[in-house]
């Protein structure tokens, strides 16, 4: 793992705020695809998760993955920042069926032997790793018919600081469709989720099946 990459994400982690104890519906666990609280679709994007093995690329504090595990999934969450694993373990380590590891996505997938039914990335590794590098590895660790889903900002919705443009892999819906089909996925669906009132940046949500 690149120490520079880990250090960069550690700095980001230091600025992140813990998720609220309950959401607007009074739930103590939930999955959120967007950058806004109580906004956008829920885990039903993934289909039924009970009995399925889930991998989250960029699991952060583990809240989204833990929610899926409460619904009957088993899950592995990886994050490149060591402090994120520590936070996730502290909050969710007592939940049966969930595991958190410190790892960079490409390195983890290259060494993995497990097969996953669901892979998700919410503003995570899919956005920050070249698709031609990452997607063959993701597909290689997925069961036939498995679900890949990920979200990030739509292309061009945020101006990047000088020197950081290459850190994010922004693609249009058509580009994502072509990339995913080319790397062994089918039934690619791209949704553009409008932001809440008074906000300007929406969310792009992509779902595909391992063919």
What are these regions (language model features)?
Residues 1-50, 63, 147-175:
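Conserved class I S-adenosyl-L-methionine
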Residues 48-49, 113, 135:
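A short, aliphatic-rich alpha-helical micro-motif
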Residues 55, 60-108:
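Class I SAM-dependent methyltransferase SAM/SAH-binding core
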Residues 110-119:
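A short acidic, Gly/Pro-enriched loop at the edge of an enzyme's catalytic core
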Residues 118-132:
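A short SAM/SAH-binding and catalytic strip from SAM-dependent methyltransferases
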Residues 132-147:
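A short glycine-rich, Lys/Arg-flanked "PGG" loop and its adjoining helix->strand segment in the class I
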Residues 186, 192-211:
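Core SAM-dependent methyltransferase catalytic element
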